[in-house]
Curated annotation (Swiss-Prot):
Recorded superkingdom: Eukaryota
Name this protein carries in UniProt: Cytochrome P450 81Q32
GO-annotated cellular components: membrane
High-level lineage: Eukaryota, Viridiplantae, Streptophyta, Embryophyta, Tracheophyta
PROSITE patterns, per the entry: CYTOCHROME_P450 (PS00086)
Chain ranges passing through the membrane: 5-25
The keyword Transferase is assigned to this record: no
Native source species: Catharanthus roseus
Enzyme Commission code(s) on record: 1.14.-.-
A GO molecular function held by the record: oxidoreductase activity, acting on paired donors, with incorporation or reduction of molecular oxygen
Length: 499
């Protein structure tokens, strides 16, 4: 009898300790944001999250408000779906939310949390951010690689020309746009072209496939990041998979560094990073350099291609908008030469189309997760230290309180309007926003403008283009875009000059 009493007492103490660890008294007394109610043991509210995270959280926000909380395993998560709350997070509380949660993916793909995207806020992150702003994404650096972008866009046009023939021909856009983005980034980074005529690299195909796998495994969708027990048993072999991906990516990146050391051309980003390594070898190790290259390839390969694919899908479903954009290009650029980057500031309607694509189909529907480094308040609610912040940009871009008819494609809504960053955030907001937004907008603008200028476009059949989205950190189309295109006279002229 006495031993049973001791056993029950022991179990009660253990359960109380676990309860206090998961749900501290100080937390329960706070004015936390609304929540879906009693969380299930161990998993919390994870059962409420569907395959498309942004849609699951949007549905919950309609019930619990634009600021609500979830208990995902043993982690408290703040979900923000309004411009006002996002602005408060990234202005008043910008430093508090400058940290990143230490998810499993960051350990392997992010070189043990040392990359600019995944590293904790601090001196190391500031060094990387400064390097990106001054050495990689400054106006001077981008202008230095202008010829690469224009050449790759021309190569895309020639590839489509060969695929379509003289009349309307069927083309699949996803792979071609991905190859363009990959080539642009790789030529800037390593001076190598991997896809296109007379170039076909199995190694690059493998690496691009690995990038796709990274985006599939990224975000806040891995249960093991929230439930330690699932990480201990390696739920669905997640950790084993990302470890294997990281090893293969690391080998590819190390080969790029090795080749640059041998060639010493001094014209690529790797060349520049290796010169920094010579002066500061203790800081710019191969691991740090590989992490920088990794971020450039991940950020530069998928997002621009996805955005152009969404934009073309929207235009094919709205041919009158496509025609209006073509008329603007012919008026501002003419019909005797290809569109150039220097033309983009004059093409306001094209810019409006891109902004509307960013709004309706953001490449990153959920911003990269943040984590609070201290207690703070958001919209009057208490947010404890260590809370994960998820900002639903997809929902903010469809907020009916700010956007008129938010589900409709209306580029005109952006005409002459200077939007606050909290209303349209395709590249994030605050000090950890994407530093490569300038490059992305140049690539997207030039590519989309050239496709409109050089081809007639039609849907395959009468049915509208399927606009369903797929899953992942970026938001791909569930069905890759296929369309009919026919070369216009301007492209015939370009082809004759090239041959």
């Amino acid at each position: 009898m006495e031993s049973s009493t001791l056993l029950y007492t022991f179990l009660a103490v253990v359960l109380l300790s676990i309860s206090l660890k998961l749900f501290p008294v100080s937390r329960r007394r706070r004015n936390l944001p609304p929540s879906p109610g009693l969380a299930l043991p161990v998993i919390g509210h994870l059962h409420l999250i569907g395959k498309l995270l942004h849609r699951s959280l949007y549905d919950l926000s309609k019930k619990y408000g634009s600021v609500f909380s979830l208990q995902l395993g043993n982690r408290l998560v703040l979900v923000v779906s309004s411009p006002a709350a996002a602005e408060e997070c990234f202005t008043k509380n910008d430093i508090v939310f400058a940290n990143r949660p230490l998810f499993i993916l960051g350990k392997y793909i992010g070189y043990n949390y040392t990359t600019m995207v995944g590293s904790p806020y601090g001196e190391h992150w500031r060094n990387l951010r400064r390097l990106a702003a001054v050495e990689i994404f400054s106006a001077g650096s981008l202008n230095r690689f202008l010829s690469i972008r224009e050449d790759e866009v021309k190569q895309l046009l020639l590839s489509l020309y060969q695929s379509s023939g003289q009349d309307f021909g069927k083309v699949e856009m996803k792979s071609k746009l991905s190859e363009l983005s990959f080539n642009v980034t790789m030529r800037m980074v390593a001076g190598k072209r991997y896809f296109g005529q007379d170039v076909d690299s199995d190694e690059a195909k493998l690496f691009r496939a690995l990038i796709g796998e990274v985006f599939e495994h990224a975000g806040a969708s891995n249960p093991g990041d929230f439930v330690p027990f699932l990480r201990w048993i390696d739920f669905k072999n997640y950790e084993k998979k990302v470890s294997k991906i990281s090893q293969e990516m690391d080998a590819f990146l190390q080969r790029l560094i090795h080749e640059s050391r041998i060639n010493k051309n001094n014209v690529t980003m790797i060349d520049h990073l290796l010169s920094l390594q010579e002066s500061q070898p203790e800081y710019y190790t191969d691991q740090i350099i590989k992490g920088i290259i990794m971020v450039l390839l991940l950020a530069g390969t998928d997002t621009s291609a996805v955005t152009v694919e969404w934009a073309m899908s929207l235009l094919l479903n709205h041919p009158e908008t496509l025609e209006k954009a073509r008329t603007e290009i012919e008026t501002q650029v003419g019909s005797n030469r290809l569109i150039e980057e220097q033309d983009l500031p004059k093409l306001t309607y094209l810019h409006n189309i891109i902004s509307e694509t960013f709004r309706l189909c953001p490449a990153a529907p959920m911003l990269v997760p943040h984590e609070s480094s201290d207690d703070c308040k958001v919209q009057g609610y208490d947010v404890p230290k260590g809370t994960i912040l998820l900002v639903n940009a997809w929902a903010i871009h469809r907020d009916p309180e700010f956007w008129d008819e938010p589900t409709l494609f209306k580029p005109e809504r952006h005409g002459g309007v200077e939007l606050e960053p909290s209303k349209l955030m395709p590249f994030g907001m605050g000090r950890r926003s994407c530093p490569g937004s300038g490059l992305a907008q140049r690539v997207v603008g030039l590519t989309l403008g050239a496709l409109i200028q050089c081809f007639e476009w039609k849907r395959i059949g009468e049915a509208k283009i399927d606009m369903a989205e797929g899953s992942g950190l970026t938001m791909p189309k569930a069905q890759p875009l296929e369309a009919l295109c026919k070369p216009r006279n301007i492209l015939h002229k370009v082809v004759s000059e090239t041959s």
